[in-house]
């Protein structure tokens, strides 16, 4: 079984909105909403990975972030470890740098059914902030 380590950025602005993107139609979990992030590379820490991934995917450099949640999740074809980082200060303005649609969404507007199933506990925790 494939094992993946994923670093994810939950970008929260001063209006308590979260920046989300939509997965590509040909990606695993196609067309689902997601928090930007990606695979942790060999020799990279989760902290380094979230900085790199947010620079690559949404064009920001995190300045202040903290571990929000770490989860293990089993899919039929893969086991993933997800490191969710709450990013509250950054340089730049987030946008879909890789062509993916991106938008700010209120915490109230987050619906776990619109995201991959591994995100459900994180969305529930975010709504309690």
From Swiss-Prot:
Chain ranges of the Nudix hydrolase domain: 1-129
Gene: mutT
UniProt key word Isomerase: no
Keywords: DNA damage, DNA repair, DNA replication, Hydrolase, Magnesium, Metal-binding, Mutator protein
Catalytic reactions of this protein: 8-oxo-dGTP + H2O = 8-oxo-dGMP + diphosphate + H(+); 8-oxo-GTP + H2O = 8-oxo-GMP + diphosphate + H(+); 8-oxo-dGDP + H2O = 8-oxo-dGMP + phosphate + H(+); 8-oxo-GDP + H2O = 8-oxo-GMP + phosphate + H(+)
Assembly, per entry: Monomer.
List of residues binding Mg(2+): 37, 57
Lineage: Bacteria, Pseudomonadati, Pseudomonadota, Gammaproteobacteria, Enterobacterales
Annotated protein name in UniProt: 8-oxo-dGTP diphosphatase
Binding, 8-oxo-dGTP: 23, 28, 34-37, 119
Motif (Nudix box): 38-59
Cross-referenced Gene3D superfamilies: Nucleoside Triphosphate Pyrophosphohydrolase (3.90.79.10)
Pfam families: NUDIX
Purpose of the protein: Specifically hydrolyzes both 8-oxo-deoxyguanosine triphosphate (8-oxo-dGTP) and 8-oxo-guanosine triphosphate (8-oxo-GTP) to the related monophosphates, thereby cleaning up the nucleotide pools and preventing misincorporation of 8-oxoGua into DNA and RNA. It prevents replicational errors by removing an oxidatively damaged form of guanine (8-oxo-dGTP) from DNA and the nucleotide pool. 8-oxo-dGTP can be inserted opposite dA and dC residues of template DNA with almost equal efficiency thus leading to A.T to G.C transversions.
UniProt-listed GO biological process terms: dGDP catabolic process; dGTP catabolic process; DNA repair; DNA replication; nucleotide-excision repair
